[in-house]
């Protein structure tokens, strides 16, 4: 599995690269933290099944970003992220 961590807003060139790589990948999970949670307000998230998207609830609340149906808004966001990162079968990419 490929794990993507996005901390940039949707129009940032790094975000665009992240979404491009996700489109070309299979078996992926997307973690949204910091300004990355603004991606929940864009259509770009249609590239993944919503249950494969994890958002930091604390960052969403701090920025006033509502959660989309099906997206995992996690209180234990960083714990889940670290568990996925530490699994030796997973590749990790940070943007």
Residue ranges and their predicted role:
Residues 2, 27-28, 53:
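Hydrophobic anchor at the start of a short beta-strand
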Residues 2-15, 34:
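Short, glycine-rich nucleotide/cofactor-binding loops
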Residues 10-30:
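Histidine-anchored nucleotide/phosphate-binding helix
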Residues 19, 41-45:
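Short, T/G/N/S-enriched strand-turn elements that build extracellular solenoid repeat scaffolds
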Residues 25, 50-51, 88-90:
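Short, well-ordered alpha-helix to beta-strand connector turns
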Residues 34-38, 58-60:
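Short beta-alpha junction loops
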Residues 45-70:
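A glycine-rich helix N-cap at a beta->alpha junction
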Residues 65-95:
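C-terminal structural segments of small proteins and small subunits
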């Amino acid at each position: 599995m490929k794990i993507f961590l996005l901390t940039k807003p949707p129009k940032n060139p790094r975000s665009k690269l992240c979404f491009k790589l996700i489109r070309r990948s299979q078996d992926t999970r997307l973690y949204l933290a910091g300004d990355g949670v603004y991606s929940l307000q864009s259509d770009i998230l249609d590239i993944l099944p919503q249950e494969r998207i994890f958002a930091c609830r604390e960052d969403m609340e701090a920025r006033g970003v509502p959660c989309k149906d099906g997206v995992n808004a996690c209180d234990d966001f960083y714990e889940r992220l670290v568990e996925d990162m530490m699994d030796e079968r997973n590749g990790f990419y940070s943007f």
